[in-house]
């Protein structure tokens, strides 16, 4: 990624980002929060991560995080369970099949960016 040196660079970068997410919403029906979560899970060393950890690194408001996780669960891209240590904690996890599906999706998005 090139460095943003002035307002013109920032405006151009913002335009490209907005276009990417608009096109992604049309093609995959995924928004920024959902793509962020999928990418975060894919880059994670573990197949399990707490929703609190996702919230901490993303700074998403609880409502948006809950809504995004539920949608991704409904799309069968991830699964959720309650922590055995603390029932209030939601654990997000992916099976090998789900992780492969996420990898395929992220690869398609990255290919779109390159073109």
Curated annotation (Swiss-Prot):
UniProt subcellular location: Cytoplasm
Induction of expression: Maximally expressed at post-exponential growth phase. Level of transcription reduced during exponential growth phase in hemB (delta-aminolevulinic acid dehydratase) mutant.
The entry's keywords: Activator, Cytoplasm, DNA-binding, Repressor, Transcription, Transcription regulation, Virulence
Outcome after substituting residue 9 to A: No effect on DNA binding to the agr promoter
Annotated effect of mutating residue 61 to A: No effect on DNA binding to the agr promoter
Effect caused by changing residue 88 to A: Abolishes DNA binding to the agr promoter
Recorded consequence of changing residue 86 to A: No effect on DNA binding to the agr promoter, but reduces DNA binding to the sarA promoter
Effect seen on changing residue 98 to A: Reduces DNA binding to both agr and sarA promoters
GO cellular component assignments: cytoplasm
Superkingdom classification of source: Bacteria
Disulfide bond residue pairs: none
GO molecular function, one term: DNA binding
DNA-binding region coordinates: 51-74
Stated consequence of mutating residue 52 to A: Abolishes DNA binding to the agr promoter
Pfam family, one: Staph_reg_Sar_Rot
Quaternary assembly: Homodimer.
Family membership: Belongs to the SarA family.
Biological function: Negative regulator of sarA transcription at late exponential and stationary growth phases. It contributes to the modulation of target genes downstream of the sarA regulatory cascade. Also, positively regulates expression of primary transcripts RNAII and RNAIII generated by agr (virulence accessory gene regulator) locus.
Listed name of the protein: HTH-type transcriptional regulator SarR
